[in-house]
Amino acid sequence: MEYNKLVRDRIPEIIAEDNREPKTRILGEEEYVTELERKLREECEEVIAAGDGDSAEHRLEELGDVLEVMLALAKIDHFGLDDIAFAAEQKRKKRGGFDKRIYLIED
């Protein structure tokens, strides 16, 4: 089976445990960022799809995947979860969150 995509670190090991031989390569920095961005889009689409009648646990699992990719992207710039949370809080203080469910029609 052909994949041609960034996978989690243990995936080749898991494939090998199934008596298959994974063919892999290590990405360079620029390609790694590109593939992380592609993976983020993929995982966000899966979060949306999980909202279509799937269980709350499935959506939570998909949100966890999004967070994992976000953390990998943040790590490239030497940021971590605390930094992401701080940036989100600063934005929330300036512009608010989404708690009030406000839908802007026009200005």
What does each of the following model-derived ranges do?
Residues 1-107:
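Flexible "arm" and connector segments at domain edges
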